[in-house]
Regions:
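Metal-dependent nuclease catalytic cores that hydrolyze phosphodiester bonds in DNA/RNA
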Residues: 1-134, 141-152
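Metal-dependent nuclease catalytic cores in nucleic-acid-processing enzymes
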Residues: 97-106, 154-178
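A structural motif
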Residues: 135-139, 176-178
Length: 178
């Protein structure tokens, strides 16, 4: 069984011009699933009905208390989010699906995609488990990625990523996450 420590190398190896080990029909199944997930995400963004925010989600758990209160109690709706920002969010979903597709084709075990979890009554959807390790997929600019690469996210986490994945880890009763 593959280990998450080799995930990046194994994904790069898919594109090295060496034949991959997975049968082409199996690859097609994974690609079909990927296509279906893209369809779900794209349609959700194109046909989403205007609604107001009004509930706390685990994805917001690391934000400052005051910002959380405002987000939950304001009358702001999804209509207030610019089209360019909505496309940026969609791009993140597409990249997440691509990462999980590549992980699967590279022979890693991908499970529990978008599994709903609850911590202290607050719901959320984790991204996935890869090789039995909780994984939260993040897309970032090269500037923002420095925090991950230089391992300084613990000191500077403006989006609350650590709190978010910690909540998912608590819901799954696991100690290891990536």
């Amino acid at each position: 069984m593959k280990q998450i420590e080799t995930l990046v190398k194994d994904i790069y190896d898919l594109f090295s011009l060496n034949p991959i080990k997975m049968d082409e029909k199996e690859v097609d199944k994974h690609i079909d699933t990927f296509g279906e997930m893209l369809k779900v995400h794209i349609k959700a963004f194109m046909y989403e009905e205007p609604r107001t925010r009004g509930n706390l989600r685990l994805s917001a758990i690391g934000k400052p208390d005051r910002q959380l209160w405002y987000d939950v109690n304001s009358k702001k709706s999804i209509e207030d989010i610019s089209s360019s920002t909505r496309i940026k969010f969609l791009y993140g979903y597409i990249l997440e699906e691509l990462l999980l597709l590549c992980a699967s084709i590279a022979g890693h075990k991908v499970t529990d995609q978008q599994k709903e979890v609850t911590v202290e009554g607050v719901k959320g959807h984790q991204d996935s488990m890869i090789d039995d390790v909780l994984v939260d997929c993040k897309s970032a600019s090269s500037y923002s990625f420095k925090k991950f690469k230089q391992n300084t996210l613990l000191e500077d986490d403006p989006f609350g990523y650590i709190a978010q994945i910690s909540a998912y880890a608590e819901a799954n009763q696991v100690n290891k996450a990536a």
